[in-house]
């Protein structure tokens, strides 16, 4: 019997492979290689264990999940187990043949990323040519098959002025929902923070754009909005609270409380091949470490919002304050709060450096060979 309520959702990061190279990607810097990915049997077992626990939703993500040839089989297995299935995709891989297979397998929803409404801007962010036209065609194919569509628009200093256009694009493409989400600075996003950080004025303009669209569109389009943490005064309840509502499975089969949890040194993350999902969720050391409120520092213990924001993001506390067990520096009570606000304002006011694109590191031998070739 479970000792804690089961997670609502499981996120299956099937692969880190992706045609795009977005500099804000939240995948880890050390990307999993193809040879490290969990096999079909492992993912099927994961879905079975999740359903047995009482999980309701399976989100297929990556990288680009449509690069996995077994994706239709996994979606069909999720459907047979009674799990709601959602595909999170770039829309530039697999195309209509794969989409036909996914529809036949019982896929229930598609989330499609959009980098910009300007074709050149979209390609610049994605590191991929003709990305917007391919996404447009994919969105049309999704809607032609009657599948619900959500657009995920990631906002930063280079596209903030075009939020109204992104909302209009969602209507044009037949989406039922759009998530207008400012970049969250984890993984590659943290590495590229200075290149992506918007100004306070840009943030204010995006808020006005979203509020205006909500009033004018009403029920025509659902609009979610996520602010950049660095300008906030209160932390968000990251993942609905550590190890409370969501569980993340990495391409290697590691069971994680969130996608960035591996950045926290000292936590031991276990693999599905070594221990059951239920046992890890209920009794795993890493899951218990920051679950609930007992771990919180004194200033959090007395906060009336402690069971609303659950202390904020542990990975961000480590990255910005040097301690995963301290206050999320987004919180105005944190000694580090003023510093991260100043950092955001300084970076936003400075010229944007070049992007460091999300690409896997080449093996040392290959890199050395390439370096020799470059000198010949």
UniProtKB/Swiss-Prot annotation:
EC number: 1.21.98.4
Catalysis performed (reactions): [PQQ precursor protein] + S-adenosyl-L-methionine = E-Y cross-linked-[PQQ precursor protein] + 5'-deoxyadenosine + L-methionine + H(+)
MF terms (GO), sorted A to Z: 4 iron, 4 sulfur cluster binding; cyclase activity; iron ion binding; oxidoreductase activity; S-adenosyl-L-methionine binding
Group of enzyme by EC: oxidoreductase
Cofactor(s) required for function per UniProt: [4Fe-4S] cluster
CDD domains registered for this protein in UniProt: Radical_SAM, SPASM_PqqE
Gene3D superfamilies: Aldolase class I
Domain Radical SAM core: residue ranges: 4-219
The keyword Membrane is assigned to this record: no
Pathway per the UniProt entry: Cofactor biosynthesis; pyrroloquinoline quinone biosynthesis
Residues annotated to bind [4Fe-4S] cluster: 18, 22, 25
Cofactor note: Binds 1 [4Fe-4S] cluster. The cluster is coordinated with 3 cysteines and an exchangeable S-adenosyl-L-methionine.
GO annotation terms (biological process): pyrroloquinoline quinone biosynthetic process
Keywords: 4Fe-4S, Iron, Iron-sulfur, Metal-binding, Oxidoreductase, PQQ biosynthesis, S-adenosyl-L-methionine
Pfam family, any one: Radical_SAM
UniProt entry tagged with the keyword S-adenosyl-L-methionine: yes
InterPro entries hit by this protein: 4Fe4S-binding_SPASM_dom, Aldolase_TIM, PQQ_synth_PqqE_bac, PqqE-like, Radical_SAM_PqqE_MftC-like, rSAM
Family: Belongs to the radical SAM superfamily. PqqE family.
Purpose: Catalyzes the cross-linking of a glutamate residue and a tyrosine residue in the PqqA protein as part of the biosynthesis of pyrroloquinoline quinone (PQQ).
Quaternary state and interactors: Interacts with PqqD. The interaction is necessary for activity of PqqE.
HAMAP family with a match to the protein in the record: PqqE
Protein name: PqqA peptide cyclase
Native source organism of the sequence: Xanthomonas campestris pv. campestris (strain B100)
Source taxonomy: Bacteria, Pseudomonadati, Pseudomonadota, Gammaproteobacteria, Lysobacterales
Gene: pqqE
